[in-house]
Amino acid sequence: MNENSENNRSIRFGFAPINWNNDDIPELGSDYTIETILSEMNQAGYEGTELGNKFPNKASSLSELLNTFNLKLASSWHSTYFVMNEQENELKNVEEKVSFLKEVNAEVINIAECSGSVHSDINKNLASKPILSDSDWELLIGSLNKAGEICNNYGIRLAYHHHMGTCVQTAE
């Protein structure tokens, strides 16, 4: 969240709805309503939230819902598949998400490369995650740089989420 915004505070705290309802394994916490999640965030004193799987996907509906609980959208997770899919399609998906984030006044997108990821499969061992070749790394890095350019064009910051069970998890 912008340090020049309300109260001119340089640090503002938000929380992720995954602490109530898991995005990777949605049955974990599925009984929580979005209203309960946002109400409890507000009661705990948080000012923002990450986008979760129970949130409306229409910008005006999302803004209205967040305003009801005096919260702002701080960021959104976005899975990319640059190594597995056509770069052009993946970049189009990034731009669509970034455009949505701009519309709801969010400032950050959290990108994770999920090609071949095992993090959402409870039956897979983390050791079975994909290992990238040198050319895969070059493709991924180049694609992330292009995604960063898209984000910059919209005034959105790109943060990379190095999730366990994804191809970027290495011993190095």
Task: State where each predicted segment sits.
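Active-site acidic/histidine proton-transfer and metal-coordination neighborhood
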Residues: 88-172
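Acidic-and-aromatic substrate-binding clefts and catalytic sites of carbohydrate-active enzymes
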Residues: 48-61, 80-92, 164-170
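Short, glycine/charged-enriched secondary-structure capping and boundary segments
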Residues: 28-30, 63-66, 123-126, 172
